[in-house]
C-alpha cells in the first residue's frame, strides 16, 4: 500500500471520529501571531514575555472576538530537558499591559523542576459582551451563557466557550515552539496543568494534541458530567450556590435532555476517554462547592486507556485551594521531575467496599509487588455538620459570613497490614455522614524551595452510611429534559 493511500486513509478515519472540538482547534486562523514584548534577566533564569493572539471567535456576536494572552516563559540556566511545562491560568482583558515580572508559580516550577515553564493567561478572554446585551460576562457566567446558546440551538457548536479556551492552549504550544527556535531551545513535548475552568481546558487539551505527554487537571472532577452533576442534587436536595450562573441561565432545564447529551459529546472529557493515553495527575479538593468529594466515582475506573493515572484529594480545601497552593505546586514539581527524568512514579490500587447494611465501609490500598512503598500513609476523615444533607462543603452560600460549615478532616497514620497493603474500616457517625480516604506520601531529594520534594496520591473517598438523602432533581422539578423551557426550580421541598 502506498504512503499516499495510507495518509488518505488515516485522514479519513480522523475526519470520521472528529468532533466540533477537533474541527475548531484544527481550523486555520490567520489571526494567530505572537510578539516578544519583554525580556527579564535573573541570576538563575531568563524570563520572556510574549503577547499571543490565538484566534478570532464569534466575531459577529462578541464585543471581544480576537483573543489575546500574555505568555510568560521561564528558561532556567543550563536547561537540558526538551519537555516544557505550561500552567493555564485566568485573567482579565482590562488594563492590558506587559507584565513586568514572572508569575511566582511559574518561577517555582521552573527552578525546582529544571524545565522550561510557561504561564498562559486570559483563559478565557474576559469580560465579553454577547449579542449586544450590555452584560459583561466573566468566568462561569460566560461559560453558562454559551452553554445556554448551544442548548437552544445545537446546530451551533461554535458557541461553546470551551472550544476557544482549548485552542488557545494549542496555539500557546505553537508559539512556545516557534519562539524557542529563536533562542536555541527545542520544546518537543508538554505537560499541561490548570485549575477550575482551566482544569477542564487541561482535560480537553490532552485529547486534541499529541505533543501533550501528561496532564494535571486541578479541581475539575467533572467527567461523565450529566450523572456527575445530577449526583449533587441527591446529596443536597438543591443545586449548590456555585452553580448559580448555570441555574440562572436555565441550563439545568436541559440536564436530562438530548441537547445536554450533544453538549457532553463535545465538551465532556469523558466522551474522549479512549484518547487519554498519557499520564494523568488529577487533583481535587475535599470540600469543593462545585463538586462532591466522591465525584471521581463517575469516571475514574473508566479511564481504561490511560497507562498511568494518579488521584489526589486535598483535605480541608474548598474550590480555590486556599492555603494549599505551595504544597500542591511542589507535588506537581515532583511529578514533572519524575516525568522528565524518566524515573518511575509510585503506583497503587485501591478497593472500596461497604457492609451489607451500608453503615460501614472499607478502603484497601495495595502497592504492587516491587512498587515504591510510601513514606507514610494516612487516613483522612470528616463528618458532615448537617444531619439532613450529605454535605461536606465549607462554604454553602454566596455570603460566606452567613454559611460557613466547620467541616474538619482529621488525619491519622496507619500501618500496613502486610507489605504494601493498607486497610481501614470505619462506621457511620451517630448522625450525618462520615467520609474518609487514604493518602500516600512519598519523599524525594531536598531542594532550594522546600526541605523535601513530596508527592501525594490518594484513593477515592468512601462515605458512610452509603446512602443519599434525596431523590433525583427531576423528582423535585429542579431539572428537565429540554422540552418544557426554562421552568425548573432549584430546591427540593424538605
UniProtKB/Swiss-Prot annotation:
GO cellular component, alphabetical, reads: extracellular region; protein-containing complex
Q: Which GO terms describe its molecular function?
A: chemorepellent activity; peptidase activity; signaling receptor binding
The family annotation for this protein states: Belongs to the pqaA family.
| Sugar attachment sites | 37, 153, 302
One protein family per Pfam:
PhoPQ_related
Q: What does this protein do?
A: Inhibitor that slows proliferation of secreting cells (also known as chalone). May function by binding to cell surface receptors. Requires cfaD for activity. Overexpression slows proliferation.
Supply the name of the protein.
Autocrine proliferation repressor protein A
- Induction notes from the record: Up-regulated by phagocytic stimuli.
Transmembrane stretches, start-end:
none
